[in-house]
């Protein structure tokens, strides 16, 4: 029996969460049912083979549960990344995007390792281009570097998830077609508030990044909290919440394209 919500009846789309993460092993089904009751569609983001298997198995027969697939940016293992890329190729018709992938200069501070990190990132940029899928990018403490690398590679179908950089590079990226998803940690982040003030509503999507980046630091986040992101955007921009929700859904459908309707969950 199907369990989930169809895209055309969604209240909101959580464009980036990690329901396949082990933090949800004990109650993944219950969390998803709670999202279903709230009218949420989820885009899961497995970043290793185990999570991808979990996502594919859990998503079977559940409308409203989609996925990208990528590689943890701080994990410097090119061989492992290539193996993950092969799994992604094999799962192409069950995916709506590649990611999250990217650069992380918060956890990887040794500059001698940055070239290897960029090598892995370029592998997945090439894969997204090959498979004609959009790219979801992790850029912790590396926002400007990620944007420059993507622009130099000529890749612009990009979602910058939980972007933590300055607004200047973000504005440039937005002008090139990049979009940005806002996590519920916005309620405790002046940087995220400034980003939302600066970027146009039509470049903003919602995300939870669950189990991370919740409203309370250190507590497990859940996908339902992407609605807190929507409320914060509405407050910052002084517009009705309904406007934020409808704009974010429209942009999510444009970004992920027909995959959200056609993908085999």
Protein language model features and the residues they cover:
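Mid-domain alpha/beta scaffold segments of enzyme catalytic cores
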Residues: 1-265
